[in-house]
Amino acid sequence: MKLAFFDTKPYDKPGFDEHIAGTDIEIKYFETRLGEDTVQLAKGFDGVCVFVNDTVNAKVVNELYDLGVRVVALRCAGFNNVDTKACFGKLHVFRVPAYSPYAVAEHAMALLLTVNRHTNKAYIRTRDFNFSLSGLTGFDLHGKTVGVVGTGKIGRIFAKICKGFGMRVLAYDKFPNPDSRLDYVELPELLRQ
């Protein structure tokens, strides 16, 4: 199978090359995004692999089909950039079913810690041999109240991480999960606290 890989980033190649080693899959990497102006690059390929900023609208779908492409593989969970109705009966569309909810929740906590402890500023200062603490002190998260809006997989994992920091967790969801062991409140109350 020959695959045209669009919107390629430097971090894409090593992982994909390793994954296809020993298979009959051949990838040609393009840094350009797939769209109406670049669809001809897919000529001679069985499939295209696209990312969030590629455009797979009806015109692109029809041209891909005319070029002999039969597969659109997305490197993301979202598929709002793909006209799935236009693909029906022509192209098979595959996407990432979900991201790791742990990775997303942990990243959210990393951002919270960065904002609170100013680690981004501290990094820049120490790199420049400035070890002043002025403007870098944050506050203890322990004992603070955090509000979690949305208690799906990611929200529940984030709440668990916050509890591990000793934080009080309030939650809001249109459809509260009774098994989550979270303290649900209405959104205005969550925002107030």
Task: Give a label for each model feature.
Residues E36-G44, N62, E186-R192:
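Short amphipathic alpha-helix with an adjacent loop that forms part of the alpha/beta core around
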Residues M1-F45:
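N-terminal glycine-/charge-rich "phosphate-binding" loop or analogous flexible N-terminal tail
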Residues H19, H107, L111, I157, ...:
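Rossmann-fold NAD(P)-dependent oxidoreductase module
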Residues F45-Y123:
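Phosphate/diphosphate ligand-binding glycine-rich loop within oxidoreductases
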Residues K28-R33, V52, R125-S134, P178-Y184:
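Short gly/ser/thr-rich secondary-structure transition/capping motifs
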Residues S134-Q193:
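Rossmann-like dinucleotide/phosphate-binding beta-alpha-beta segment
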Residues T8-Y11, E31-G35, V52-V56, R75-F79, ...:
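Short beta->alpha connector loops
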